[in-house]
C-alpha cells in the first residue's frame, strides 16, 4: 500500500467497522425534552444511518485505501477498564439489562448496546 503523497509518516490508521455497529439501538429520541404528547420523538443523531453514511463517505473518497482494516473482537473487562472505570461499565450493563435507556449525558442505549460496544 502506498502512503499519501503529502506525507512521509509511516504511521497507519486502523478502521474498525461491523454490521453489528448498525444494530446499536438508540431508541426514539427528542433531544433535550422528554417525548410526550407535545414533543414528537425521532431518530437520535447517533443512529445506523449516520454510521453507514460515514462508512460510505470514507469509501466514496478513497480514504479506505489508506486505512488498515481491523475486525472488532470481544475483549475482557480488564481491557475495557483501560479506558472506562468499573462504575461506568456497571452502569452501562445495568441500563442495557433493563431494556435500554439513558446512559447519561443524553446518550441513549438499547438492550444490546453493551455487547455491541
For the regions a language model picked out, list residue spans one by one:
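HDAC/HDAC-like amidohydrolase catalytic core signature
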Residues: 1-117
Amino acid at each position: 500500500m502506498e502512503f499519501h503523497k503529502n506525507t512521509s509518516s509511516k504511521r497507519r490508521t486502523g478502521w474498525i467497522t461491523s454490521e453489528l455497529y448498525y444494530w446499536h439501538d438508540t431508541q426514539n429520541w427528542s433531544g433535550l425534552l422528554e417525548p410526550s404528547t407535545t414533543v414528537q420523538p425521532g431518530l437520535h443523531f447517533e443512529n445506523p444511518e449516520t454510521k453507514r453514511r460515514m462508512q460510505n463517505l470514507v469509501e466514496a473518497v478513497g480514504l479506505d485505501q489508506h486505512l488498515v482494516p481491523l475486525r472488532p473482537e470481544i475483549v475482557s473487562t480488564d481491557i475495557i477498564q483501560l479506558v472506562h472505570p468499573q462504575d461506568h461499565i456497571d452502569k452501562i450493563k445495568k441500563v442495557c439489562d433493563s431494556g435500554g435507556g439513558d446512559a447519561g449525558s443524553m446518550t441513549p442505549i438499547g438492550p444490546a448496546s453493551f455487547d455491541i460496544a
